[in-house]
């Protein structure tokens, strides 16, 4: 069955006439959503704690900023863009008591709705607009007249108007320039977590670092090992992004292709481990483990962060990256990223 995909012609921004959208959080996604919607003509207010370091930053961008409860109280749509582990507490304390009758709740990830940490009453529309890219790219693409694709879903539709609202939000974000794919909160949550854990982060990160270890332990220069197992990865990903895995393969030598086809690193046992990880995501085991750890002060999370904060390939990575002339040419983007990291590194109401 073909996926349902919507584009700009399929949404109408007049849905927002006379409505106000509250963006809770001003981190990676929060700043992009607030600025893009504002620049699309939507009435936006940013909800932050008065003591948040992001208050002045958001005001510098010309945005209206209010305490979370006040922002929620005057909004017709409330987009919650906080880290998963903080959403339920903020919802209970600041959102639920102040939510206008019939106001819509929106999310960029289905975690808290899917696993039941947030349970809105049935009279509130609930939808999701989840960009398939980090916030600074969502903003940069919008400013360039392009967009980052999104997946969209509706969980509760009490008035029959939630889909038009959801698509209008995606259009205001700039996402319908690229396209919005219909999904569900369940599908988005489970596939997103799986992709992170088994391929994009839990797969590639470990594979690259282990490859670096194998080569350097065998006596090869760390600089050469870095190039072979990490630096070239971006080029292959760019090719795959343009034309799929086949284009990436066809762009490499016959020798490289043969080595790809005959490799024994990824096996049926790997698939079984991935299926086990998916099961833990589906039955809620992973979510419970993560949320329980966070509730206890995140001791395991902090220990793991420290344990993995010094990947072996980064013993030479910074020096090599500083040598690349194109990195100097991209200094503007680097400065933007550093500014983001320094000012709004965490998407939470501080």
From Swiss-Prot:
Broad EC category: oxidoreductase
Cofactor note: Binds 2 magnesium ions per subunit.
Xref: InterPro entries: 6-PGluconate_DH-like_C_sf, KARI, KARI_C, KARI_N, KARI_prok, NAD(P)-bd_dom_sf
Residues annotated as binding NADP(+): 26-29, 49, 52, 54, 84-87, 135
Region (Disordered): 331-350
Cellular component terms (Gene Ontology): cytosol
Sequence ranges assigned to domain KARI N-terminal Rossmann in this UniProt record: 3-183
Domain called KARI C-terminal knotted: residue spans: 184-327
Keywords from the named record: Amino-acid biosynthesis, Branched-chain amino acid biosynthesis, Magnesium, Metal-binding, NADP, Oxidoreductase
EC number(s) recorded for this UniProt protein: 1.1.1.86
Cofactor(s) needed by this chain: Mg(2+)
GO MF term list: ketol-acid reductoisomerase activity; magnesium ion binding; NADP binding
This protein's name: Ketol-acid reductoisomerase (NADP(+)) 2
Source species taxonomy: Bacteria, Bacillati, Actinomycetota, Actinomycetes, Bifidobacteriales
């Amino acid at each position: 069955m073909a996926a349902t995909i919507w584009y700009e012609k399929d949404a109408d921004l007049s849905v927002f006439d006379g409505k106000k959208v509250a963006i809770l959080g001003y981190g990676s996604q929060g700043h992009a959503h607030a600025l893009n919607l504002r620049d699309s003509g939507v009435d936006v207010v940013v909800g932050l704690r008065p003591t948040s370091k992001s208050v002045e930053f958001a005001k510098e961008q010309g945005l209206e900023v209010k305490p979370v409860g006040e922002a929620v109280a005057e909004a017709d749509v409330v987009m919650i863009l906080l880290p998963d582990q903080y959403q339920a507490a903020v919802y209970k304390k600041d959102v639920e008591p102040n939510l206008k009758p019939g106001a819509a709740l929106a999310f960029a990830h289905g975690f808290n709705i899917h696993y039941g940490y947030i349970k809105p009453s049935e009279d509130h529309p609930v939808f999701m607009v989840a960009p398939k890219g980090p916030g600074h790219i969502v903003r940069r693409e919008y400013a360039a007249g392009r967009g980052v694709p999104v997946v969209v879903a509706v969980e509760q539709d009490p008035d029959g108007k939630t889909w038009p609202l959801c698509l209008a939000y995606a259009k205001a974000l700039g996402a319908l320039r690229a396209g919005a794919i219909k999904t569900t909160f369940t599908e988005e949550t489970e596939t997103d977590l799986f992709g992170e854990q088994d391929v994009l982060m839990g797969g590639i990160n470990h594979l690259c670092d282990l490859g670096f270890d194998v080569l350097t332990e065998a006596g090869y220069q760390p600089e050469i090992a870095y190039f072979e197992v990490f630096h070239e990865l971006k080029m292959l990903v760019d090719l795959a992004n343009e034309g799929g895995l086949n284009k990436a393969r066809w762009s490499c030598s016959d020798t490289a292709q043969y080595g790809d086809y005959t490799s024994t690193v990824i096996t049926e046992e790997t698939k079984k481990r991935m299926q086990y990880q998916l099961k833990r995501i589906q039955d809620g085991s992973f979510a419970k483990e993560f949320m329980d750890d966070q509730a206890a002060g995140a001791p395991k999370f902090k220990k793991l962060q420290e344990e993995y904060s010094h990947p072996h390939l980064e013993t030479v990575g910074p020096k090599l990256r500083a040598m690349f002339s194109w990195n100097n040419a991209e200094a503007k983007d680097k400065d933007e990223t550093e500014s983001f990291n320094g000012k709004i590194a965490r998407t939470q109401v501080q």
